[in-house]
């Protein structure tokens, strides 16, 4: 059976799709790209926003319309959070949650045998353990993601993810080390550790995120270890000190801000204020001279006044993020914020997004200007039209002239100029 995969959402979803791809291959099936003929399609959904749900439905209907005879498996966070709505999507032959991604192969083979529609969604349990399969590779990438944590117990008022993902659970250190060794042998030199609430890694255990970095960095072939999205209030001085001591650690800190206004942060049930965040960024930049701080910012949250938005805008400009992902608040049924007063219109959200993106791009441009004249080690990924592109340790995009394939190589590059969203350099 030829199987193709569609992935929406975060790096954890990308990892889990890769796990399903490997599981199908191990069972004797053939993974194929989306533009090749296929017998089955797996759609791994996201539900962080209403737009994510819309895109999932759109892909589902398109796949069914263009492939009426294919087996379609709908899984992921949308299914887990809104199972009855997912069940009603009759274009899917199999609807299954994300509690055990390994079972997608079993469901597909069962449907292939008897043709009966399958609906299997079980709730996450407090006693649930980390059970995501270990990967041996990561298709079509030069850096590998490694999922080391699942679940979230923080319950930000806007977020449905605790419902979709359950409580915090962590991958054992021995499994991290073993998977890193396997990825190293497969030719990967950089690993990105990812999770739903990554800084909660090790909660209730006798290890933490620093131990995870050290375990992933153990193989000689692994030259870089990067962290995914981080919660600011977990980043203590001791954590920064231990990360600094790990020579393979990449000094990019993606610290989820969400808002630069204290009143808004309080309504969001975030666990810090702007004073704490400002101090943390200062401490990071003191410990890591070449650090980049990147972030996510939400605009148009329930009750966000123009004054609150202006404070958030000013804070983003003050911090000077290397990169900012800007997105509009999406009202999600099942969250506290769904019932909050002061819901913002779509038009106002769009206008605030425009203003925030404008500020974010200005900060990014300024950050890249400061790299000019420096020599940075770049992990090259893509090549096109006589240019090769890759990323520095602090995740700045760099482009160089090159007619040869540099994919997967880490080379020193002298930064000679900067554009709005990338730098230009010469290989030394």
Predicted regions, residues:
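Generic beta-strand/beta-sheet core signal
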Residues: 6, 75, 194-196, 228-230, ...
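Terminal RNA-binding accessory module
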Residues: 339-428
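Conserved strand-turn element in the central/C-terminal portion of the radical SAM core barrel
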Residues: 159, 163-166, 225-233, 259-269, ...
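Radical SAM/AdoMet-radical enzyme domain recognition
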Residues: 185, 210-224, 235-295
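Contiguous mid-protein beta-loop-alpha structural module that forms a pocket-lining wall or clamp
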Residues: 304, 319-321
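Proteins enriched for Cys/Gly/acidic motifs involved in redox and nucleic-acid/cofactor modification
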Residues: 1-201, 238, 243, 249, ...
